Amino acid sequence: MLPSKKYLLIAIITLATLLLGFVFSGYLTLLLLGLDTKLFTWNTYYQYYHAIGQPQVAPFVGKIKWAGYLGFGLPLLVLLVTGLVLLLKKDKRSLHGDARFATGADLSKHGMFKKTGQSIVVGSHGGKLVRLDGQQFVILAAPTRSGKGVGVVIPNLLEYGESLVVLDIKQENFDLTSGWRASQGQEIYLFNPFAEDRRTHRWNPLSYVSDDPAFRVSDLMSIAAMLYPDGAEDQKFWVSQARNAFMAFTLYLFENWDDERSSGFPGGSGTPTLGAVYRLSSGDGSDLKKYLKALSERSFLSSNARSAFANMLSQADETFASILGTFKEPLNPWINPVLDKATSSNDFLLTDVRRKKMTIYIGIQPNKLAESRLIINLFFSQLINLNTKELPKSNPDLKYQCLLLMDEFTSIGKVEIIASAVSYMAGYNIRLLPIIQSMSQLDATYGREVSRTIITNHALQILYAPREQQDANDYSDMLGYTTVRKKNVTHAREKTHNFTEERRALMLPQELKAMGPDKEVFLYEGIPHPVKCDKIRYYKDRYFTSRLLPKVDVPMLNV
C-alpha cells in the first residue's frame, strides 16, 4: 500500500472511531446509571454530559464521566493499535514486479505541468502540456515520419525561452518559428553554408583561435582533432600526419597575418579561414613539395610552424602525397564558393549563446547532408568546446541556458566532444535534446558502451512506437514488469477455483509497436513509473498556431 493511502485510511478510521466513541459512551452511561437501555439514542451521551452542571445530576457526574472515558478510550485504543500496525507493516512485494504508469498527480508533484523559460516540452497529459525544467537532458527515439517535428521540435522552438541552436534539415523550422523567436527579443541567425539562394549568416571556425602565440597551437590542435578524429589503429599514422599538416598550414596563415599587421601592410590577407587553408595547401601549380619548402623558409615563421613543415616535407614522395590526400579530404568541400564565403567571417559568435538570448538555425538541404556532415560536426564540436571552459557561477555574464536541439542526431556522425562531455555539460548550462530514429542507430554511430553512457546522462527518454523488433523488445524491458493474478478453474468431482501470480510486461513489444501515431511513452529519472501520454500536434493547438509568424529575413552572400 502506498504511504498516502495508509494515511488516508487512518484518517477515515479515526473519524469513524470518534463517532463510535460518542455513541458507545451514551450506551455505557445508561448501563452505569442502572437505567433502561431502551432509552438509548445516538446522542444520549451529549444529553447527559450537557446536564452535568445541574444540581440533581451532581451525584452521578462520576459515572457519566467514566462512561465517556470508557466509551471513547476503548475505540481509541483499538485505533492506536491498528494505526501502528498499518504504519509499521512492510509492503508485500509482488512476486514479479509492481510496474505501473504514472498518473497526472505524479507529474504534478514533480512540477511537470509548470512553464518556465527553460522548460522543454515533452508531451501532453490530460490536455495539459508536460514539461521538463532545469538543466537535465532529453532524448527522443522516433522512427522517420512519426511526428517528431510536429510533436517536439516545433513546439519547443515556439516555447523555449532562452538560447537555442537547432539542426534544421530542410529549413522548415526556420520558416515556421524564426518570426516568433525574433518577436521575443531573440537574435536570429541562419547558417546554411550550401544555400542555393545564397542566403546565410557567416561563421568562421578559425576566428576563435587565440591571437596569443602561447595559446594558438592548443586552439589549432583542438580544431585539428575535430577535423581529423581518431580512427582505427592502422589509421593512427595518417591521422597524426594530417593533423601535423593542418598545423603547418594554419600556423603559416596566422603568422603571416601577424607579420602583415605588425608591419602595417594595408589590407593584407585578413583572418585565416578554412578556405584559405585549402587554397594554400593546393599550391600555385608548380611542384608542390618545392612550393611548400619555400613557404617553410619564410622569415616570420615560428619554430612550431617550421617543425610542422619539416615533419611533412621529410616524408618520401609517395607518403607525402598520401598525407596531403588525407589532410585535404575534409577540406575538399571548400572548393564551393558559397561554403567558402559562408565561413569567411562572423555574423554571430558561438561564445555569446550564454550571454544573450539568440537562436541559430543550421539549415541544410537533405541532398547536401553528406557533404555538410563534417562542417556541422565541427560547428557543434566548437560550440560545446568553447562553452565548457567557464562555469556560469564564475561569470555572471553567462546568465542564459543554451539548448542544442539536434534533429537527425546521428546524421552528422560521431561528435567526439559529446561522447566525452555529456556527463558535465549541464553544469555549464549547455543542454541537449538529440533526436534519433532508434537506440540501435545510436549504437551504430557511437558504439554500444558510449551510446549507453549518452542515454544514461539523459534524464528523460521519450519513446515513440518503434518499428524494429529489437527496439520494441528493449523498450518493453525498460518499462518493467507487473504481477497479474490469473484465475484457474478445474473440473473434477467438484468445481474448484485457484489463483496464480504471473509476470507480465507493463507493455508487451507488440503493444509498443501498436501504440499508434498519437501516443508516446517517456521515462524520467525523477518519477519511478513510466509515463504514457499524448503526442503534441502543434497545428491542432491554438497555443502554438497563434505563434506562427512570418520568417526573419536573411542577408544574401556576395558571391
Briefly describe each language-model feature range.
Residues 52-57, 355, 453-454, 499, ...:
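Short alpha-helix boundary/capping motifs
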Residues 120-125, 344, 444-445:
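Short gly/ser/thr-rich secondary-structure transition/capping motifs
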Residues 41-42, 263, 344, 396, ...:
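Flexible domain-boundary/linker segments
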Residues 15, 408, 462:
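Short, flexible active-site loop motifs that bind/organize anionic cofactors or intermediates
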Residues 1-146, 150-153, 205, 481, ...:
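Basic- and hydrophobic-enriched, low-structure N-terminal and domain-boundary segments
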Residues 422-424, 428-521:
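Conserved ATP-driven motor cores of ASCE-family P-loop NTPases powering translocation/secretion/packaging/pilus
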Residues 18-30, 34, 88-95, 129-430, ...:
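P-loop NTPase motor domains
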